[in-house]
Amino acid sequence: MRKNRFMANAILVLLAMAFASCEKPKPLPNIDIVSEASPREPKIPCVIVYSENGEIMMENARVKTRGGASCVFHKISYTFKMDHSLSLAGLPKQKSYILNANYIDKSFMHHKICFDLFREMNPLKNLASECAYVTVSLNGTYNGLYVLMQKLNAGSLGLNKKDSLAMIFKDPPVFFGENRLDPQWVQEPGNYFQQNYPDIEDEDMNGYLENVMQFMIHADDSTFAREIGHIFDLENIIDWHLLLMFTNNGDGVMKNFYLYKRDSHTPFRIAIWDYDDAFGRDGEGELKMTESLPNFERCLLLNRLENNPFLDYNTLLKQRYKALRDSGLFSKKKIERMIRDNDRTIRDYVERNFERWPVDGYGYYDAYRYEEEIEVMRKYLDIRIPQLDAELGYH
């Protein structure tokens, strides 16, 4: 009798869990950018009207468009800075946020999955933007599904602003080495390494990073092996390296990251950024699967780490890969779970987005629909994981 009662209770618990998993998620928050001028103009005044669960909040802000190559698309990304620090969509409280149009990735998942995975690999050392899905309106007119992103800055990266060696660079060409970036691609003349913090007018840290690059170019193998772990956090670098391999992000080898140093006592670390190039698509949205793979030889740091006879970097890389596979973080099951969680959140919103921005619109290489993009990710994992297992000796 007791056994039957136990079984009945267990069945009720399972049914309750199943019912809970089938419940629809809460409606997505909406961000309405209200302004008299076009958001395509730089840093215009606006009001952010934030709606969530029937509650409305309004905050004065300044907004501007953002993005490099993505600016050619009609669906635009934005960044805005409010007068006060607020938490939007459950993200950490701050004044500045990014609204990523996510136009080229029709799954809306590449950035979020990669950022979440990188942080989970090592929460203390691997930083990336926290993200949430929102809908966006411009002056009350629906503009699509967006990814709201935490802005990476001195606060979110944990810098000690009182330390003279705290610094941030966005997409610094430090790994180009002697193949210096063509001046036409330098965004700010006089700021070759794209210093983000401190303000270059207050203190120019380009010389500091130039010295780091010169060390990587000229140090003999013995000196390089002895000193490189004091300059870069190699645990963080290995995780970055492996994530690039796992996702097949060739663009991310030389750019699409923040390089930051918290203070005098911590080495440089990488915070990842921009993973459109992932899970079977390249950075422009063209289908590639594993036809092309990242070229790590062109990255000054990774090339020297992999080929230094005094370092056991390749062994460490394989050991870390094994740990990630054994833990389940680098597995199809893990990514499938992340896909399901994100799909549950946005599935009811993608159709309207693609009514506004058709799947065969400007800039797309094909007319794959949302469901087909998810299938691309799954097929990619079926190909890539066995490749990496063989390459890195995982059994």
What spans do the regions from the language model cover?
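A conserved helix-loop-beta module that forms one wall/lid of the active-site cleft
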Residues: 106-137
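Conserved NTP-binding catalytic cores of kinases and kinase-like/nucleotidyltransferase enzymes
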Residues: 23-113
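Internal "kinase-insert"/substrate-recognition segments embedded within catalytic cores
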Residues: 87, 101-103, 124-127, 141-242, ...
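Short, solvent-exposed loop/turn and secondary-structure capping segments
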Residues: 91-93, 110-112, 146-148, 156-162, ...
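Bacterial N-terminal signal peptides that target proteins for export
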Residues: 2-11
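C-terminal motif of bacterial Sec signal peptides marking the signal peptidase cleavage site
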Residues: 19-21
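Middle-to-C-terminal accessory/interaction subdomains
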Residues: 57-61, 68-69, 73, 201-253, ...
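Structural recognition of the beta-strand scaffold that forms the well-ordered cores
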Residues: 79-81, 97-101, 108, 135, ...
